[in-house]
Amino acid sequence: LKKPYIIPDGYGIIGIVFILAILGGYFISLYVAVIPFLLGVYLLYFFRNPTRTITAAANELVSPADGTVMAIEWVQEDSYFFKKCRKIVVFLSVFNVHVNRAPLAGTIDFQQYTCGRFKPAYKEGVGYENERYSIGINKGTHRILVTLIAGILARRIVSWVSLGDRLDHGQLYGMIKLGSCAEIYVDEDVDILVHIGDKLRGGETVIGRIIS
């Protein structure tokens, strides 16, 4: 089944903005139509869903999102792993593709939505303060945790999956609207293959490899 190039979640707001542009241009002035028209063009760009080819091996983790690696660190994770693990933080600007993909094939065995604040997603510590949505993906022999974090502009996290769903490698499962951050938590048996500052492509860039 061919996937739409524009995410359906954006149809409503895109349609409203272009209708405002048409009405403004028709009843008031073409100059009035410029701002909503440009906003509509940007929203088409923001809600894009480009085709990605998943070529990673079964033991390789792909990036869940487009963006830039902000941090790689050891942390104590107390909602899914309940132990120290490594966290990779990816910042998504308003110009990145914002759909999110499963880094690994497996079953969703954990799902948690947490209300919070809307601080800028690039600031340190927002993963503990901002609104966020997490899923745990269980491959059978290995598990990972992915957390999507809202930002100062990103006020809504959209999920298209439920607890118990089976995800394919690189499968779309959600998005964060208008600038955000994604965190990937992995066990010690994963060899991290990216570095701070690296640019990532969701579903294509290999960020880690299971070594056991």
Enumerate the language-model features and the residues they cover.
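Contiguous, well-folded functional domains in the mature portion of proteins
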Residues: 1-212
